[in-house]
Amino acid sequence: MTIKVGINGFGRIGRIVFRAAQKRSDIEIVAINDLLDADYMAYMLKYDSTHGRFDGTVEVKDGHLIVNGKKIRVTAERDPANLKWDEVGVDVVAEATGIFLTDETARKHITAGAKKVVLTGPSKDNTPMFVKGANFDKYAGQDIVSNASCTTNCLAPLAKVINDNFGIIEGLMTTVHATTATQKTVDGPSHKDWRGGRGASQNIIPSSTGAAKAVGKVLPELNGKLTGMAFRVPTPNVSVVDLTVRLEKPATYEQIKAAVKAAAEGEMKGVLGYTEDDVVSTDFNGEVCTSVFDAKAGIALNDNFVKLVSWYDNETGYSNKVLDLIAHISK
């Protein structure tokens, strides 16, 4: 059965979700809603400064997109309740505007005829978050779910492997995070986050992130044990998590590497990766795993106190897991 998907919001994540869906036979994008006109939408889909040209054909006909010969309905509605998803048979909406992140607001998609909704960002209420490699097995039929954040998708699988094998007493996370659309090209007004208003290409910017605390929501056994922060850096894509933890059960760094490698080759294949190469951030542009453990970058002070490093393409990896969650809730 092909799952019919509508995308609301055709920004960075909306477009990368669309691109990733073209490589899957189980998911078909049938509709896109954004306030862009169709010609500009086609242009934004065709050309991408980070991920290159779209691999396929993109045309506009009668105000709609024709991608690889298939028509995709284009609308420009501000209110999701008016989207008439049922007219094109939408099963699941990928809510990618970054605006409708509560059950109450996202439920407008259900009103408009969709069966289920996946939020492509952490929910702002108690809407459950699901992360592949962490808690997909806890899904219990909810019609509105969140795929959490790109950083939580990197941290949670790694934290789960470490906690399951050695136990985590407590930990601090830092994500060295690529620039995103919320930042400023030059210094500009940012009333809630003064540092965040400084020029993205000129600065390393300390920032807050709820990603580590959110791990406690997807892995309740780690609730209250992790917190973290971010540094925004002047790179266009690919971020890296630095997780420093105290272990319950003493372990050498070699034992930790072996446990992560076993998980990456076993139950977490496609989610958690493992490398012993001398890699840098651009080596992960286009990476579909949401967390690639860098065995050479981590260090241990002793057998109870370690720093672990894991890479993620904060656009591609996350967007692929949005599709995995869509498939999972459609079973």
From Swiss-Prot:
One of its GO terms (cellular component) is cytoplasm. It catalyses: D-glyceraldehyde 3-phosphate + phosphate + NAD(+) = (2R)-3-phospho-glyceroyl phosphate + NADH + H(+). It comes from the Bacteria. The active site is at C150. One of its GO terms (molecular function) is glyceraldehyde-3-phosphate dehydrogenase (NAD+) (phosphorylating) activity. Its EC number is 1.2.1.12. Keywords: Cytoplasm, Glycolysis, NAD, Nucleotide-binding, Oxidoreductase. D-glyceraldehyde 3-phosphate binds at S149, C150, T151, T180, T209, G210, R232. NAD(+) binds at R12, I13, D34, R78, T120, N314. Belongs to the glyceraldehyde-3-phosphate dehydrogenase family. This is Glyceraldehyde-3-phosphate dehydrogenase.
